C-alpha cells in the first residue's frame, strides 16, 4: 500500500514542478503592431505556447531551458492578415484557367490549392475565405491543414 502512495506523491510533485512545464517560443520583436491601437510597441517579447500567443511583454525576456527564441529585433511583427475573397484552386490564373477545366482533374486542383495555400500563408495571410471550387478540394485541404498533413 505504501508503494502506490509514494508513486502517486512523486508523480504529483513532478507534474506540478517547473520541470513539467511546456517549452515556449519567445519572439523578440523590435516593433509590434497588435491592432489594438494605432501605435507600435517597441522591444517586446511575444510568448507563444501551443501555437497560440500567450502574452506580449515589454522588453526581451530571457529564455528558460527548452524555450525557443526567434530573434526579430530588427523587424516589425503584426498579426496575421485575413483575405475574405480567395479561390485557392484557381488563384493567379489567367484566361488559361478556364481552359484547364477540360484538362485538370480533382487531384490536380487539390494540389494546386495546397500550393496556393502555402503561398498565401507565406504572404502573411493566416485566415482566408474560399469562395468556391468544383470538387470540394478546399474542404479536403482545410482538413489536411488541420491534421498537419499540409501547410497553410
Segments and roles (model prediction):
Residues 21-23:
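Boundary at the C-terminal end of the N-terminal hydrophobic targeting segment
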Residues 76-144, 149:
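Metal-associated gating/positioning segment near the N- to mid-region
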Residues 32, 36-78:
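Histidine-rich, glycine-flanked metal-binding segment
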Residues 65, 151-152:
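Short acidic capping loops at alpha-helix termini that bridge into adjacent secondary structure
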Residues 1-8:
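Bacterial N-terminal signal peptides that target proteins for export
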Residues 17-18:
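N-terminal signal peptide c-region/cleavage motif recognized by signal peptidases
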Residues 11-12:
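Repetitive helical segments and hydrophobic/amphipathic motifs
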Amino acid at each position: 500500500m505504501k508503494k502506490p502512495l509514494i508513486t502517486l506523491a512523486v508523480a504529483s510533485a513532478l507534474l506540478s514542478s517547473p520541470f513539467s512545464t511546456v517549452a515556449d517560443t519567445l519572439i523578440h520583436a523590435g516593433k509590434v503592431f497588435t491592432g489594438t491601437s494605432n501605435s507600435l510597441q517597441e522591444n517586446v517579447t511575444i510568448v507563444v505556447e501551443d501555437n497560440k500567443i500567450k502574452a506580449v511583454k515589454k522588453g526581451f525576456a530571457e529564455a528558460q531551458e527548452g524555450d525557443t527564441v526567434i530573434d526579430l529585433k530588427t523587424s516589425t511583427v503584426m498579426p496575421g492578415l485575413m483575405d475574405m475573397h480567395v479561390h485557392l484552386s484557381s488563384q493567379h490564373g489567367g484566361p488559361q484557367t478556364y481552359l484547364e477545366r477540360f484538362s485538370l482533374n480533382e487531384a490536380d486542383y487539390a494540389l494546386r490549392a495546397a500550393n496556393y495555400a502555402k503561398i498565401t500563408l507565406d504572404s502573411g495571410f493566416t485566415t482566408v475565405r474560399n469562395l468556391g471550387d468544383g470538387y470540394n478540394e478546399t474542404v479536403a485541404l482545410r482538413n489536411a491543414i488541420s491534421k498537419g498533413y499540409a501547410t497553410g
